[in-house]
């Protein structure tokens, strides 16, 4: 029996998987440049075939499960994590009208999907029957839940400025000025919260090698490990896309000039996403890992009060000057 997959869905999934593969290569190249070494340059010209070689290596490896693990949950956890990282793209507009489903509650949809992501990690840690995997899963769950609160309050600030949860309308509201300029402190907090939400350095505490070996995926090999890996990098691209949509005008050109308007909006969107992905990699190369208590303190004692305090003056200014949408 064949399952028909619409071309629109394939048009999102295939470029995303290709982007994840070359994002890994770009990360290794940038890390090598920062550390004054060459990086991968053997497989293909300039190492361009290295992602293909890594993918084949993972596919051909034998999937090994711990003898005491819950087999069904152990196998389903990476699948759930990877699928959630894909379905979130259903409401992300790449250009005006270029979106799979232009929901009026797109913002709430994204927040709901990101909240579900923690379940795959918790199930992976619990079903592995390993203390290291379980401790990594608990850390990840606490970290993701903590920073989702700050992300929610930050998005309320954007929501107040626009008056809509539709992502296309949020982008069109930035025709005069990108929200990242008047709300620059909010943009910085949102990006740092995205680092913590995706378990990326310097907040990669769930995968701290010196403490937890490899965190919640320590018992995974072959395609199970590959799906967790793909899910993590797909979430990186998603969060970079959200930073672009909410604060850098999405597909809108940098300047309102005729020459820039000739460039397709999807190209502008991709350029801005690549900028945030470069920041992801640069932060990993430049900053040391936080201690766990510092990470949680930053989320609850700094970002939560600041993001909440930011909602009040923004809404007050909009009401005072009658700028409410």
UniProtKB/Swiss-Prot annotation:
One of its Pfam families is NADHdh
Q: Which InterPro entries match?
A: NADH_UbQ_OxRdtase_su1/FPO, NADH_UbQ_OxRdtase_su1_CS
Membrane topology category: Multi-pass membrane protein
E.C. number(s) listed in UniProt: 7.1.1.2
**Enzyme class of the recorded protein, top EC level:** translocase
Q: Where located?
A: Mitochondrion inner membrane
> GO biological process: any one?
aerobic respiration
- What broad class describes the main subcellular location of this protein? mitochondrion
A GO CC term? respiratory chain complex I
Keyword terms: Electron transport, Membrane, Mitochondrion, Mitochondrion inner membrane, NAD, Respiratory chain, Translocase, Transmembrane, Transmembrane helix, Transport, Ubiquinone
Question: What superkingdom heads the lineage?
Answer: Eukaryota
Q: What else is known?
A: A stretch of 270 kb of the mitochondrial genome is duplicated within the centromere of chromosome 2 resulting in the duplication of the gene. The expression of the duplicated genes (At2g07785 and At2g07786) is not demonstrated. They are also probably not RNA edited and therefore differs in all the positions known to be edited.
Subunit structure, as described in the record: Complex I is composed of at least 49 different subunits.
Family membership, please give it: Belongs to the complex I subunit 1 family.
Question: In its UniProt entry, what is this protein called?
Answer: NADH-ubiquinone oxidoreductase chain 1
Q: Which organism is it from?
A: Arabidopsis thaliana
Could you tell me the gene encoding this protein? ND1
């Amino acid at each position: 029996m064949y399952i028909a997959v619409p071309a629109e869905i394939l048009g999102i999934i295939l470029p995303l998987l290709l982007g994840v593969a070359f994002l890994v290569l770009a990360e290794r190249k940038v890390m090598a440049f920062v550390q004054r070494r060459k990086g991968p340059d053997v497989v293909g010209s300039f190492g361009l075939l290295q992602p293909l070689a890594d993918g084949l290596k993972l596919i051909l490896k034998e999937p090994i499960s711990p003898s005491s693990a819950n087999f069904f949950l152990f196998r389903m956890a990476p699948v759930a994590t990877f699928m959630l990282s894909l379905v979130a793209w259903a409401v992300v507009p790449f250009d005006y009208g270029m979106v799979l489903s232009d929901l009026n509650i797109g913002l709430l949809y994204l927040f709901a999907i990101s909240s579900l992501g923690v379940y795959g990690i918790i199930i992976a840690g619990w079903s592995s029957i390993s203390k290291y995997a379980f401790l990594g899963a608990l850390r990840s769950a606490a970290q993701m839940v903590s920073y989702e609160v700050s992300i929610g309050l930050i998005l309320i600030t954007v929501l107040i400025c626009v008056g809509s949860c539709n992502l296309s309308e949020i982008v069109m509201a930035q025709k005069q000025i990108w929200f990242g300029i008047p709300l620059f402190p909010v943009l910085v907090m949102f990006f740092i919260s995205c680092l913590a939400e995706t378990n990326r350095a310097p907040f990669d505490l769930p995968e701290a090698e010196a403490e937890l070996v490899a965190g919640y995926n320590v018992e995974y090999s072959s395609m199970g490990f590959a799906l967790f890996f793909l899910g993590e990098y797909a979430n990186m691209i998603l969060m970079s896309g959200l930073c672009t949509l909410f604060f850098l005008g999405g597909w809108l050109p940098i300047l309102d000039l005729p020459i820039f308007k000739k460039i397709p909006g999807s190209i502008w969107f991709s350029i801005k996403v690549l900028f945030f992905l470069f920041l992801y990699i640069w932060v990993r190369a430049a900053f040391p890992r936080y201690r766990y208590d510092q990470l949680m303190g930053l989320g609850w004692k700094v970002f939560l009060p600041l993001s909440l305090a930011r909602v009040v003056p923004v809404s007050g200014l909009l009401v005072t000057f009658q700028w409410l949408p």
